[in-house]
Amino acid sequence: MTQEINKNYNPKEIEQANYQNWEASGKFACGNTDSKDTYTIMLPPPNVTGTLHMGHGFQMSLMDILIRYNRMSGKDTLWQPGTDHAGIATQMVVERQLNAQGISRHDLGRENFVSKVWEWKELSGGTITSQMRRIGASPDWDRERFTMDKGLSDAVKKCFIKLYEDGLAYRGERLVNWDPKLKTAVSDLEVAQVDKQGSLWHFIYPVADSDEKIIIATTRPETMLGDMAVAVHPEDERYTHLVGKMINLPLTDRQIPIIADDYVEKDFGTGCVKITPAHDFNDYEMGKRHNLPMLNILTDDATLNTNVPSKYQGLDRFEARKQVVADMEALGLLDKIEPHALKVPTGDRTGEILEPYLTKQWFVKADVLAKPAIEAVEKGDVRFVPDNWKNTYFAWMRDIQDWCVSRQLWWGHRIPAWYDEAGNAYVGEDEADVRAKYNLADDIAIKQDEDVFDTWFSSALWPFSTLGWPEQTPELAKYYPTSVLVTGFDIIFFWVARMMMFGMYFMNDVPFRDIYITGLIRDSEGQKMSKSKGNVLDPVDLIDGISLDELLKKRTTGLMQPQMKAKIEKATKKEFPEGISAYGADAVRFTYAALASTSRDISFDTARVEGYRNFCNKLWNASRFVMMNLDDYKVCDNYELGVADKWIWSVLNTATADVHRHLANYRFDLVTNTIYDLVWNNYCDWYVEFAKVALKDDSLSEQQKNGVKYTLTKVLENILALAHPLIPFITESIYQQLKAHLNDAKDTIMDVSYPVATQALEAPEAEKAIVWLQNVVTTLRNMRSEVGIKPSLEISLIVKDVADKDREYLAQTEGFIKALARINNIEFNDNPPTSLSQIVEGLELNIPLAGLVDIEAEKARLDKELDKLKDEVDRVQKKLSNERFVSNAPEAVVAAEQEKLAKYQELYAKTLEKKEALG
């Protein structure tokens, strides 16, 4: 792995080669250590045919930081990779490709279509895993799993069969979210609530055998054909006399009852609600309470079926809507139409308006499974980070409904249920198992269920199916429960809760000890990133760079709303006039870590990435300096540490303790702050400068100079190890160069033990001395700058009011002061000549100005400056003393003027101080 450290830091040159070496070395594998202490993360499996988006990049970077940290800490780490078959998403992609050729899946038939999907999976399934490699992810690739692998498919069957045999899985007719385009039930996660401006139609319903009438309001007039009741509040005096009477349902020959139910809000609208149990989730629950018939009026493609009058049969739902409104108006039963803001449930993949639809599906009794999963969090067996997310979890779990697990798709795990001609269901591993289990003779025809499982069903088994369950494998015993789940808040219910339920039920233990919930990455304006907004950033583009033309093409191709193209192009050109620079994987990873705060929303700005690329560059250049000054030095015990050496070791020690603490609390943002401060502000800006001075100082002994070289080398090694989990590529490259100077070098930095803090390195006195030195040097530099003394010019320094501690610090650091503040002589004198003076921690620093500055000319210049500032102070004071201005101007304008006044007054005081210092 030895490589030259180039003059310039170029991420592209180092990243690919390093990754290939890591993967070839087998260092990512679990079981590489005898340690009984394990650390396991299950990668939330991304869609097999997908590509890496910002959320993936963000979460994968955080997972990799945890894995690399624990691996270097000596634990047996398993990061289990894999991909999800993503039923609906993948089937839609392949269907679109076939449709472009004029072929439907029905033309091919199920078997041939599924073969086509497998072909597509093999063709494009490697994209996301290659992108994971590009970002530096280090999972155990030899254990990669796919949710449709045989082992995982067998686990899905075993799980369902057990649930069925235990009475927790059943087939029933219930209301589901139905996508008429896909002709399948979809999960709540795949429902987008889209804001639309619609209408509210008020219809008149005549009461049977009476002159009375009731007015109801609806946003979906066509559903009135499926009404089974009208509900009123039991305490609504306007209607109590009507409860139990019948309504002549217009446009039909049916009568429906008037019922009383607490669900109805008396004060909303007319206080009367039409009840359509087969086409509304709330109505469905009320229908069950009142034993109302469930009349389905739609087919699976959302046309009206034979349960409606013949006039409406076969009409599309929206055509039927128009016809119903027209017919009600013709009968004089349309009271009024009002504009109404709606939230329309829409399929997030198809854009189709979804329908609550009554259909036979397979369900899992969720309340039974939820109870132990709730208790596990209540008892503290699982910790949510941040803690407040457990409230979201509890809210969902305590109000859980039975889970519809069947989907009307062809791609996925087919439900292991068979039916005879009478419709009886038989559940088993395969047809032979079913016949044996239920004693079915060969002449009894049975047919397998056409449906597949909801993708979340197989995903819920991921923490243990990937480890070999239902077999009791050594891996299952060793790595379950896992250590932490890193995921987004949007799938706490859909995935986290279901893994908890299945983990508790099938493994009798929680699937993970910690659940770290990340925020949502938004753009620099705080907007959610979406293709339709044209503000999506691709992590790989941030790593490798992309031209403006390519970025525009990427953002405007295949838009759902082509009219947005011009707006997207304009915004993109404004934000990225030159395209996106290549920042490298390390800078992108460091940015992700820096953004991982406790916030729910995270604004991503490429300026941050650029800043962290500069950080990497700073580390690279400091490392080059170290190598260039070590010559043939190799770490040895023949050294003596000076005050600056002890200081940087002590600072490193504190930073090391802080990093461990922050990682234990998942405060990645604080980890980056700590490492950034250590590297940039302490090692590079100060210690490297001290080292330059010390190595040129002929008065130092060989042992003392060895102390500097030892510290330069070993502190750099520790910095590289500390930072490696965050910025693995650059730290590996520098380590390979540093190895020549180490006496205990490893093949790769991944084998270096993660640094730990130790009391022996604490040096509070050295820290005090160097803080004192930094204050003195910084003050002297500022003083020189104030009066325009050239940086290259060496000057004298007179010190006054010198306490014993100051003398001690001066003795320890005099060489550094002289070199870093360009001082040629330090004199003790309590009556200095005309000087520029500053007091630092009680010590008076004086720079004699004779021969350096024309004092009279400088005073004249400062007088002019004072006159200008006084004019500004007077002008603003006059404005603020004007009562009319203060009472009439906006608060912000008045506040701005007050700020100006404070600023000018401060500048005036400082300038006057400068003048007085000249005597």
From Swiss-Prot:
GO terms for molecular function: aminoacyl-tRNA deacylase activity; ATP binding; valine-tRNA ligase activity. Its EC number is 6.1.1.9. Keywords: Aminoacyl-tRNA synthetase, ATP-binding, Coiled coil, Cytoplasm, Ligase, Nucleotide-binding, Protein biosynthesis. One of its GO terms (cellular component) is cytosol. Signal peptide: none annotated. Residues 849-919 form a coiled coil. GO terms for biological process: valyl-tRNA aminoacylation. It is found in: Cytoplasm. A motif ('KMSKS' region) lies at residues 528-532. ATP binds at residue 531. It comes from the Bacteria. Its main location: cytoplasm. It catalyses: tRNA(Val) + L-valine + ATP = L-valyl-tRNA(Val) + AMP + diphosphate. A motif ('HIGH' region) lies at residues 46-56. Catalyzes the attachment of valine to tRNA(Val). As ValRS can inadvertently accommodate and process structurally similar amino acids such as threonine, to avoid such errors, it has a 'posttransfer' editing activity that hydrolyzes mischarged Thr-tRNA(Val) in a tRNA-dependent manner. ValRS has two distinct active sites: one for aminoacylation and one for editing. The misactivated threonine is translocated from the active site to the editing site. Belongs to the class-I aminoacyl-tRNA synthetase family. ValS type 1 subfamily. Monomer. This is Valine--tRNA ligase. It comes from Francisella tularensis subsp. tularensis (strain SCHU S4 / Schu 4).
